[in-house]
C-alpha cells in the first residue's frame, strides 16, 4: 500500500476498496515506492483496463509530488476488449477477465486487478 496525499478516504472509496486511513497511516509515500518500482519498469509499456482513469491517477500523483511524469507507452485492455470481444454483455474488468479464462475473485483489490489485467493483456494484445 501507498499512503495517499492527503491520507483521507471518502465513504465511496472505503466501500469499494475496503481501505481507510488506518490502513495507510504507516505506508510509504509515493516517491519512496516509485524509487523501487521505476528501475523494474525501465522502458516497458504500462497496461491498464481503462487507461484514461489509471493514467489520470498516475499523472495526478506525479503532480502532487512535483515529479516529472515519465511518458510511458500505455496500452488499454478495455479499448482492445471492445474491439476483439464485441459480443460481451459489458466490458468491465471482471467480465473481460472471465471471457479470457481468468476468474477475478477480489475485484478492486489492486494486486488482483493488476493480475487480471495482465492476464487479459496476454490473451488479447
PLM regions with names:
Residues 85-87, 124-125:
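Short helix-capping/linker segments at secondary-structure and domain boundaries
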Residues 99, 118-125:
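Acidic two-metal-ion nuclease catalytic site recognized across multiple nuclease folds
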Residues 113:
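Conserved catalytic/binding loops enriched for acidic/polar residues
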Residues 1-71, 86-108:
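Conserved non-catalytic scaffold segment of RNase H-like nuclease domains
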Residues 63, 82-83, 122:
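Arginine residue identity/basic-tract feature
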Residues 58, 80, 117-121:
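Buried hydrophobic packing segments
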Residues 68-81:
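Conserved beta-strand -> loop -> alpha-helix junction used to position metal-binding or nucleic-acid-contacting
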Amino acid at each position: 500500500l501507498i499512503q495517499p496525499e492527503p491520507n483521507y478516504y471518502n465513504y465511496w472509496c472505503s466501500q469499494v476498496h475496503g481501505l481507510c486511513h488506518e490502513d495507510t497511516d504507516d505506508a510509504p509515500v509515493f516517491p519512496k515506492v516509485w524509487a523501487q518500482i521505476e528501475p523494474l519498469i525501465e522502458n516497458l509499456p504500462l497496461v491498464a483496463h481503462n487507461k484514461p482513469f489509471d493514467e489520470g491517477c498516475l499523472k495526478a500523483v506525479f503532480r502532487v509530488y512535483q515529479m516529472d511524469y515519465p511518458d510511458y507507452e500505455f496500452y488499454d485492455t478495455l479499448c482492445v476488449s471492445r474491439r476483439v470481444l464485441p459480443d460481451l454483455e459489458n466490458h468491465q474488468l471482471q467480465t473481460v477477465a472471465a471471457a479470457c479464462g481468468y476468474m477475478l475473485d477480489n475485484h478492486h483489490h489492486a494486486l488482483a486487478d493488476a493480475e487480471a489485467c495482465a492476464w487479459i493483456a496476454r490473451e488479447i494484445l
